């Protein structure tokens, strides 16, 4: 029997986003999961079909091959295939993490059911940091203060008020999970009384309210690498929220935001700046000082430089955090028009303008070209 189109299997269009594909798969997996349909061969086949479609369309390379060649591009039994297909349910828990763990009683890393309290990885934390362009370019070491959980000094981490005890949950008898019948099938879910801990605290600690920990602040050392760009994140492993029931802690992600600079604009590893010069320097040329992140450099402006001209200073940008190569600095020329002139200065400019126009296109090539275009426009 010919295979159905993977997009048709998931019920999405060929232009569906990764998020839409994932949502469609989750919906079908929930509907046809074997735990919900224990005696249905049809449901099992539909589940496998949906899983195979998701494995192909969620992988960029496999999806590209399928879009171009169809099933021939990904079938291991055909030339050019990627060699992937639906084989059992091994990738199911990995694809969904703990989303189905609470529904079907599966631990976060496998399908063991009814085996006591589950361990969960702690949540990741995000810390937003604003730095200057100079700090981003050169890198530096700094300290940040982030929320942190400490052991409660009142109950010493037990969660129970001193003098009382922690008891085995009377609902799940320490298993952390209970069986619930819904219609024609039975599911395992997290115990609603102990929330999967398997323990029950009749008299919670008055300070930490049964958590066994209290929130505080922790100082961390953070190394900002040279060349870091807007929106990049630095991971500090193990400094997120603590795990549950002995699970590993999450990570802390420091998200970098760069302040606007008064002189430079950044474009990747390149820098841009506007450089005002006088009319005289633009006409006759001359040396000017150009600012860079490493200090001032001397640049020779060629004579006859026009407004809007851009000069490129190689290697005067930012050394990329990934590439290791320095970008360039682009200097955009802005010719300043003199203001608040004296009468003597005005007269000198009139004489200069007259002498320039007597030379025609020899002195003002752009103006002469524009005048020629206007004449042609009105004479046509």
UniProtKB/Swiss-Prot annotation:
SMART domains: DnaJ (SM00271). It comes from the Bacteria. Zn(2+) 1 binds at residues 152, 155, 205, 208. It is found in: Cytoplasm. A zinc finger (CR-type) spans 139-217. Zn(2+) 2 binds at residues 169, 172, 191, 194. GO terms for cellular component: cytoplasm. One of its GO terms (molecular function) is heat shock protein binding. CXXCXGXG motif repeats lie at residues 152-159, 169-176, 191-198, 205-212. Binds 2 Zn(2+) ions per monomer. Its main location: cytoplasm. The keyword Ribonucleoprotein does not apply. The keyword Repeat applies. Keywords: Chaperone, Cytoplasm, DNA replication, Metal-binding, Repeat, Stress response, Zinc, Zinc-finger. Its cofactor is Zn(2+). Residues 5-70 form the J domain. One of its GO terms (biological process) is chaperone cofactor-dependent protein refolding. Pfam families: DnaJ, DnaJ_C, DnaJ_CXXCXGXG. PANTHER family: CHAPERONE PROTEIN DNAJ (PTHR43096:SF48), DNAJ HOMOLOG 1, MITOCHONDRIAL-RELATED (PTHR43096). The J domain is necessary and sufficient to stimulate DnaK ATPase activity. Zinc center 1 plays an important role in the autonomous, DnaK-independent chaperone activity of DnaJ. Zinc center 2 is essential for interaction with DnaK and for DnaJ activity. Homodimer. Belongs to the DnaJ family. Participates actively in the response to hyperosmotic and heat shock by preventing the aggregation of stress-denatured proteins and by disaggregating proteins, also in an autonomous, DnaK-independent fashion. Unfolded proteins bind initially to DnaJ; upon interaction with the DnaJ-bound protein, DnaK hydrolyzes its bound ATP, resulting in the formation of a stable complex. GrpE releases ADP from DnaK; ATP binding to DnaK triggers the release of the substrate protein, thus completing the reaction cycle. This is Chaperone protein DnaJ. It comes from Ralstonia nicotianae (strain ATCC BAA-1114 / GMI1000) (Ralstonia solanacearum).
């Amino acid at each position: 029997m010919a295979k159905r189109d993977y997009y048709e299997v998931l019920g999405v269009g060929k232009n569906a986003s990764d998020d839409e594909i994932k949502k469609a798969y989750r919906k079908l997996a929930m509907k046809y999961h074997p735990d919900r349909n224990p005696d249905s061969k049809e449901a099992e086949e539909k589940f496998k079909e949906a899983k195979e479609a998701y494995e192909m369309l969620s992988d960029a390379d496999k999806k590209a091959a399928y879009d171009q060649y169809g099933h021939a591009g990904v079938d291991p039994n055909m030339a050019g295939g990627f060699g992937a297909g639906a084989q059992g349910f091994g990738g199911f828990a990995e694809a969904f993490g703990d989303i189905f763990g609470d529904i079907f009683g599966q631990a976060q890393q496998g399908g063991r059911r009814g085996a006591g309290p589950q361990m969960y990885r702690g949540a990741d934390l995000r810390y937003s940091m604003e730095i200057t362009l100079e700090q981003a370019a050169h890198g530096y070491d700094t300290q940040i203060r982030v929320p942190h959980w400490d052991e409660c000094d009142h109950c010493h981490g037990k969660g129970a008020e001193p003098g009382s005890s922690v008891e085995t949950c009377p609902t799940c008898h320490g298993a952390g999970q209970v069986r619930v019948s819904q219609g024609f099938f039975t599911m395992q879910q997290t115990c609603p009384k102990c929330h999967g801990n398997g323990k029950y605290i009749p008299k919670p600690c008055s300070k930490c309210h049964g958590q066994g920990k209290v929130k505080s602040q922790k100082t961390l050392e953070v190394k900002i690498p040279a060349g870091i760009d807007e929106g990049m994140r630095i991971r500090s492993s193990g400094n997120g929220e603590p795990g549950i029931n002995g699970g590993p802690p999450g990570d802390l992600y420091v998200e970098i935001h760069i302040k606007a600079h008064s002189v430079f604009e950044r474009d990747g590893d390149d820098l841009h700046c506007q450089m005002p010069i006088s009319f005289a320097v633009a006409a006759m040329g001359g040396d000017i000082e150009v600012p860079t992140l490493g200090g001032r450099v001397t640049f020779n402006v060629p004579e006859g430089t026009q407004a809007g001209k851009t000069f490129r200073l190689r290697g005067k940008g930012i050394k990329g955090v990934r590439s290791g190569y320095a970008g360039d600095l682009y200097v955009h020329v802005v010719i300043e028009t003199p203001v608040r002139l004296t009468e003597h200065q005005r007269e000198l400019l009139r004489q200069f303008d007259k002498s320039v126009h007597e030379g025609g296109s020899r002195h003002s090539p752009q103006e002469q070209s524009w005048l020629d275009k206007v004449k042609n426009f009105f004479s046509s």
